[in-house]
Amino acid sequence: MKITMIEAFPFDLRYKPTRDFLVSYGVIDEMRNAIVRVTTDDGVVGYGELMPLPLDNRDACIEDLKNIGKAVIGQDPYEIRELHARMDEQLSAELPSQELLLKGAIDSALYDIMGRAAGLPVYKLLGGSYNDGVPMHFSISIGSPEEMGADTAARVAEGFRTIEVKLGRFQGELDLDTEIARIAAIRESAGPDVVIVADPNIGWTVEEAIDVLPAMEEFGIYIEQPVKGLDDLEKVHRAIRSPLIADESAANTRVLAEIIQRDAADMINLKILRTGGLYEACKMLDMCEAFDIGYRHDNVIQSRLASTMMIHFSTTYQASIPDCGGTQFTRTIEDIVNDDEGVYMDGGTAKLYDPDAPGMGATPKPELLRDPIPIAG
């Protein structure tokens, strides 16, 4: 079996007209991603999802995908190690996240092909087992303490046992007392047993983080990458007692090795598309387990297609915080996956409609696959 063609299909998904989803770097009100389809000479097809970075940079990312895509044409999709080496030759030496996201889209399609060809779900290829679903977290948008507390109460009532709280400056403004009030309101609404992960999305300075985090300790939180860069993350880690999670700084095995060597964080937040796909993600979590570094599963801005692959991966590795990201698809009006395929939400738990379906078990709706953009082949 050989890879013969790669195509991309852009799609736009609008967010539901509820309270705006605000994070420290702006407002997210739509998803402008692309489906990536990889075809083989045996007729087996696999799908991945491309999230552009920056989020409004889809057209340029699709063009960049052509450089990576041509490296795998004519190759056996089962030779995943060789295919990643070929794709890596097309990447910059510093491995920026936007390039790893391109590789992650193709990687997901390759694993989908392998599963479909073998007649096995992807989680079995990875050595995992499906145990009736994966607990998910839900992200609470930046807002007033009252708004965020109300949002938290609603999500806990739905069955979510982990809440990720968006913090950080928005539109250039930051008030540390308000940040503390937000966490206090969320803990009060969530109760004592819900896990709270505070995520400023690198929206604080080192000084702000060291100033505000001691005041949040009483609320029993985890703190996810409050500052930009590994040097600053290490400074914060040495100054606080709350468990610190590396996110933006934990993009690949090379950086993870540095995090471990420098003791720059207690845990990492792993997003399979951002790491370059399942192949690299598995290596990263094997490293975490070998060096006793905690980890949690999370998502980028992705549809139900990529979230389905995330569930396959999450059944393979038991995270330190028993939750997974991937609920962004619940915020969109439209959907790109066929009904009764892939992942769905049952309260705060993500489940697969058919856990025995080969590959990812999810196929994009036919109407989204009518106008392909040729990538390679």
Annotated model-derived regions:
Residues 1-47, 51-53, 332-338:
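Structured beta-strand/loop patches that form or line metal/cofactor-binding pockets in enzymes
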Residues 5, 39-117:
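Metal- or metallocofactor-binding catalytic centers and their adjacent structured scaffolds
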